[in-house]
Design a protein with these regions (language model features):
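N-terminal pro-sequences and low-complexity stem/linker regions of secreted or lumenal proteins
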Residues: 1-362
Length: 362
């Protein structure tokens, strides 16, 4: 709802919209031109377990038991994304799956910190020029670094079969004085995604490409269905056009779809049992011409207002993702955009039950 509630045909509540079409025109164009997924849910709660879910289809027992103490400020560390070996998935991540199957792979910023891979399987398999997470660097700059590396590999016919690219500035920095506004951060992130689509669509490997875009976690944002519901996108030569898919999908289902395309086995019981995005694909490829849409919002706009939400933002740590209480941060973003008079909505927790059909007795 925070991003796509204004999409025609989707299950959205526009009263919860924060970053609509005027801020995220490229993501809206992707959802409109390809597939609108309005029933996608992340499997994770926060970034600490979210990146492990996104790359490995589960977070282990240690990580699931320790992130709550870390996030509540009661001790412990982040742990995820390879930060602590004990928190890594037992059989590794999707890159390990690729390695075992002889599938080429490369990472741009994911599980990379300070110019170093955080898991051994990514040594010599990541772009050293691509900046890892940090809100001082724009996502459009990250796109340019990816573009340069991609073009050099394409010229040598060495583009890996599996790639992960991280654009993370839609985390935003709240309303800290002198820093980009939430709108500016999200618009920058959206433009990077649009530029990525534009460049890939013009490349000779478009028909062989399938791109899946997801958030590692939903940041406990307001949603009228469930706080785990999250924006997700898929585009590529074989992806359907102008299609709305209400099928319930998940992080693990998206991973399973990638595995099926690459001929990989599932990594865990979760991706093995998840629903792949079958309905999103067509039988034949279709060319696509796209020009990235420059958001109407000023990408350079800075926070200038001194108020309660600015004071709360100044107390937060944005040096590392999810270093703050997600509910507190969600409240800051809500009131910074909606104003003080509209109450912050209570996070929605839904239960999804599929009743088994009873067979008639003879």
């Amino acid at each position: 709802d925070q991003v796509l509630a204004d999409m025609p045909g989707g299950n959205g509540d526009t009263s919860l919209l924060l970053f609509g079409k005027n801020i995220t025109p490229n993501q809206h164009a992707i959802a409109s031109n390809f597939v609108l997924l309005d029933n996608f849910y992340v499997d994770s709660e926060v970034s600490a377990d979210g990146h492990n879910w996104s790359m490995g289809a589960y977070a282990n027992d240690y990580l699931e038991k320790t992130w709550p103490t870390s996030y509540s400020g009661r001790g412990g560390t982040y742990g995820g994304e390879g930060e602590r070996e004990i928190a890594n998935n037992k059989n590794g991540f999707i890159w390990n799956n690729c390695y075992r199957a002889g599938i080429s792979y490369r990472s741009y910023g994911e599980f990379v910190t300070g110019g170093k891979a955080t898991v051994p399987v990514l040594n010599d398999h990541f772009c050293k020029d691509f900046p890892s997470y940090g809100l001082n660097i724009t996502d459009t700059l990250r796109f340019k670094r990816w573009q340069r590396d991609f073009d050099s590999l394409l010229a040598k016919d060495q583009v890996p079969k599996f790639n992960t690219v991280r654009f993370g500035n839609d985390h935003t920095e709240g309303t800290r004085i002198g820093r980009p506004t939430p709108y500016a951060h999200v618009a920058d992130n959206d433009l990077a995604v649009g530029l990525f689509l534009e460049h890939l669509a013009k490349s000779p490997i478009w028909n062989e490409s399938a791109v899946f875009v997801l958030e590692d976690d939903a940041q406990n944002g307001a949603d009228h269905v469930d706080a785990h519901r999250s924006p997700a996108y898929v585009f590529g030569g074989f992806v359907k056009r102008n299609f709305i898919d209400h099928t319930p999908y998940s992080t693990s289902g998206m991973l399973r779809t990638m595995e099926l395309i690459l001929g990989l086995p599932p990594m865990t019981q979760y991706d093995a049992g998840a629903t792949p995005l079958w309905r999103c694909f067509a039988n034949t490829p279709t060319p696509f011409n796209y020009k990235a849409i420059i958001p109407s919002y000023n990408l350079l706009e800075k926070n200038t207002a001194y108020n309660e939400w600015q004071k709360r933002s100044e107390k937060l740590n944005f040096a590392k993702e999810d270093s703050n209480n997600d509910l507190e941060f969600s409240k800051i973003l809500w009131h910074a955009i909606k104003g003080n008079d509209i109450p912050f909505p209570t996070p929605r927790r839904a239960a999804f039950i599929i009743p088994a059909s009873e067979k008639d007795e003879d």
